[in-house]
């Protein structure tokens, strides 16, 4: 992989991992259309690490508060307000995707990586679901109103993100909106819920990478991938959280539909 490809894929990962438009779909479809070689596990680790760094940098205050709430909540659970229980709900919401990912991620990835038409269809189908969620429901709840039940439901929805074209942030935001949370709360909880999963994915892939080693020729592309995905991931988080305070998610809906339709045309007639 050359530095140009590493830069483009790093930018794509940074933007699409955070925005509700599916990073896996873009990272499969773009190299397919441009006839680039597969990036491989080494570069996947770099991209995940970059977006993980971006999320940690943006939410560092939240993470410190969550750590404090975790130990406080353990000491006196019954008398803690709901907001202090948030770290436990994030952990509970992480379990479904962690278990399903451990059991089926490789099978699902191999199945859908060879089916770009299905990926394009999922981009469209789950765009319509996001549109429905964005226009229905009360949307009155803030993140402090999260409960164990709602955290687990959103966590179960996150399992669908293993399918390329669904989008981790897209499906968790959709689930939260359908449960009555406002857009900002849905987006913020989606990002916080993604941190353990993104970290776990990076560590899991890194463990395999350490066994094989990193070829010297891959070092520069890896560093470029980490840097670009981190920078654009940070920008994307800031952009989305500001956007949801004043407008709907329909720009992402139309984008997903457009990309899905263009991909189907290219695949079938290109």
Swiss-Prot record:
It is an enzyme of class 3 (hydrolase). Its EC number is 3.6.1.27. GO terms for biological process: cell wall organization; peptidoglycan biosynthetic process; regulation of cell shape; response to antibiotic. It is found in: Cell inner membrane. The keyword Membrane applies. Keywords: Antibiotic resistance, Cell inner membrane, Cell membrane, Cell shape, Cell wall biogenesis/degradation, Hydrolase, Membrane, Peptidoglycan synthesis, Transmembrane, Transmembrane helix. It comes from the Bacteria. Its main location: membrane. One of its GO terms (cellular component) is plasma membrane. GO terms for molecular function: undecaprenyl-diphosphatase activity. The chain crosses the membrane at residues 14-34, 40-60, 88-108, 117-137, 146-166, 189-209, 221-241, 249-269. Pfam families: BacA (PF02673). It is a multi-pass membrane protein. It catalyses: di-trans,octa-cis-undecaprenyl diphosphate + H2O = di-trans,octa-cis-undecaprenyl phosphate + phosphate + H(+). Belongs to the UppP family. Bacitracin is thought to be involved in the inhibition of peptidoglycan synthesis by sequestering undecaprenyl diphosphate, thereby reducing the pool of lipid carrier available. Catalyzes the dephosphorylation of undecaprenyl diphosphate (UPP). Confers resistance to bacitracin. This is Undecaprenyl-diphosphatase.
